[in-house]
Swiss-Prot record:
Heme 1 (or BL or b562) is low-potential and absorbs at about 562 nm, and heme 2 (or BH or b566) is high-potential and absorbs at about 566 nm. This is Cytochrome b. SUPFAM superfamilies: a domain/subunit of cytochrome bc1 complex (Ubiquinol-cytochrome c reductase) (SSF81648), Transmembrane di-heme cytochromes (SSF81342). It is a multi-pass membrane protein. Heme b b562 binds at residues 83, 182. GO terms for molecular function: metal ion binding; ubiquinol-cytochrome-c reductase activity.
Amino acid sequence: MTITRKKHPLFKIINHSFINLPTPSNISSWWNFGSLLGLCLMVQILTGLFLAMHYTSDTTTAFSSVAHICRDVNYGWLIRYMHANGASMFFICLFLHVGRGIYYGSYNMIETWNVGIVLLLTVMATAFMGYVLPWGQMSFWGATVITNLLSAIPYIGSTLVEWIWGGFSVDKPTLTRFFAFHFILPFIITALVLVHLLFLHETGSTNPTGLNSDADKIPFHPYYTIKDLLGALLLLSALMILVLFFPDALGDPDNYTPANPLNTPAHIKPEWYFLFAYAILRSIPNKLGGVLALLLSILILALMPILHTSKQRTLVFRPITQTVYWILVADLLILTWIGGQPVEYPFAIIGQAASIAYFSIIVILMPIAGIIENDIMDLN
């Protein structure tokens, strides 16, 4: 008699995805971040669900309802800070996951990569709308500044902004619809994750060498389930240290002041995980140009498969491109720092230089490095 998990219509999907999945025997801990992102998503959906039970999406009571959650609801403070800091952990895992994909040439699995880009954009949209919900100063002004960017779209821009606002400024209708979208998007993300996995399992995972590993595959369970479990334990430990010891380390003090449309904060800035894109946006003096650069900072990832010039898949045996890659990582850290600084000398000029470097590295330097390495290999 065959085991139920191999025959049952529902269980066999799980069996082929998480138990008997043939997996390369040499994948490193960099391949853990997919499962960690799944864990982050589950934590966010669960904590978000419990927060939604006590939150009110009305401008007069939103701020008070968040204070009520922290003060009066049993373990409300824990749920709230797990949700807020869980978003930070989510983005840390996302950036490392994308960074791994670039380093090991995973972008050559085009469908998986493109669904991943859509996922990244959707998670960013969800996080942005979530930041608006507590209705603090930075929530309100962040929403005003970012939604206002759509007014840069020629002809329909102003109408579009008012349509999104539901009025002539960010107000009650904006908050209500942002809450509705923030609630539904994680479920859309979950569906996209399944599509992402569907495409991944069509080709199978890559491995650090970039070579075909069909001859050396092992079952996912128990080898990688136990490895993912260790990763999950480390992630949850890091999250709980953040939540229990430094809950406000990554937040903005301005968000503990209720939203006031008559008082603009000195420095309007988004959460830390958007600072690199915000720096690119601010580094271009033209409004429409800034919006396009902001979009391109993420969408440029879709060009990675086209810009791949090397005969090798990964960067493991390519020291020149490795150097360029780590310069790109340093550049992104500089952009993140600049995004949190005021627009004045010397920050403005550093931001412009770092923005030019960001696009130049991806579009020009990495493809050239690949060609040079091909030529060096041909000489041998």
